[in-house]
């Protein structure tokens, strides 16, 4: 990306003195809605690091289900989208990528297990690294990024995460460990049980 392109993108966010001010969920939504060009992965990461959530602010968006994690869209434009995901203990995604979208994830409550995968020479999915993420942490998803995330708590602690993606998710590619086969999942499909 050229310096001019980076400067233009940076100007679509907030003025310099404002870039360290904490953001409420409403302020983050307004910031995303005001964008005139796609934010970078680094900018999404920085925005989620500034997020200061009150439990009451998230409560209307929370929906836990016993058999699957849930996703609820909080904001969407042509440039980006923001989702809240709710996880019961032990729930996790399939191994997947975001088919060209990049983003950032903030753990709001609970702890997250993040598994990163790679493709071997035969194109098969193999485990690469594992990370434990605590409440308040932010992690990024770049392109390409094959991973699996989930609620690491074996007990009764639920997990809540905020995800911001650019561009908005259209297709999620799914994988099986040790296989080169690639499946597809459509996040907006009403039949997707994760959509709340």
Where are the predicted features?
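Extended, aromatic/histidine-rich regions of cofactor-dependent oxidoreductases associated
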Residues: 162, 169-196
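Short acidic-glycine-tyrosine-enriched beta hairpin
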Residues: 104, 119-147, 187
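A short glycine-rich, His/Asp/Glu-containing loop-to-beta-strand
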Residues: 60-91, 138
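Short beta-strand His + acidic residue motifs that chelate non-heme Fe in jelly-roll/DSBH
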Residues: 94-96, 114-115, 141, 147-153
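A short hydrophobic beta-strand segment most commonly corresponding to one strand
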Residues: 104-106, 155-171
